[in-house]
């Protein structure tokens, strides 16, 4: 996993735009984690919502269209609590919000990790799988490390 982290960080550091950074993140993390879905939701301060900005595994046409209020759904819960959420049956959680346009219905396992920069939640990285299971501690640690290291790149890319 360390080799994968190094590769991801090198690619992100050479990216020229926020969309490119996010595309690298979702593709590489999904591949390394062997997940069905990897998505990034970023906070849009103009309307206080988390917006699906990149995904590998959900319907591409849902990018930019899925918008959750700051405390809506599992994404909002992860952001609000500022800590990872690892669920084997996400659709059974009281905070679960289903968005038909994403095509996420076959995915049950959920790992959400906040992307935090200078104590400010920039967004949430989400991993999903079809089978019902908790993500392993090593997988969660990998996702947390990715978010911690990439928060600065996302903040920088969003500011330029």
Predicted regions span which residues?
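Signal-transducing coupling segments at domain and membrane junctions
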Residues: 60-62, 88-109, 129
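Allosteric cytosolic regulatory segments
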Residues: 144-151
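Short beta-strand-to-loop transition segments that serve as allosteric relay/switch motifs
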Residues: 58, 124-133
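Signal-transmission linkers at sensory-effector interfaces
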Residues: 1-20, 31, 122, 153-160
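Acidic/proline- and glycine-rich, intrinsically disordered low-complexity segments
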Residues: 60-85
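Short regulatory alpha-helical segment in sensory/regulatory domains of signaling proteins that mediates
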Residues: 9-14, 25-34, 42-44, 60, ...
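A short, aliphatic-rich beta-strand micro-motif
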Residues: 108-116, 124
């Amino acid at each position: 996993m360390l080799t994968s982290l190094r590769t991801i960080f090198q690619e992100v550091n050479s990216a020229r735009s926020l969309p490119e950074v996010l595309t690298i993140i979702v593709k590489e993390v999904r591949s390394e984690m062997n997940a069905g879905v990897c998505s990034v939701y970023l906070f849009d301060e103009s309307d206080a919502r988390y917006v699906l900005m990149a995904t590998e595994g959900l319907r591409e046409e849902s990018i930019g269209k899925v918008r959750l209020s700051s405390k809506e759904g599992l994404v909002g819960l992860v952001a609000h609590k500022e800590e990872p959420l690892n669920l084997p049956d996400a659709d059974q959680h009281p905070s679960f919000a289903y968005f038909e346009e994403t095509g996420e219905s076959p995915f049950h396992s959920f790992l959400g990790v906040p992307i935090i920069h200078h104590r400010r939640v920039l967004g949430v990285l989400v991993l999903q799988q079809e089978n019902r299971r908790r993500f392993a501690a090593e997988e969660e640690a990998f996702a947390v490390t990715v978010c911690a290291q990439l928060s600065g790149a996302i903040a920088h890319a969003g500011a330029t």
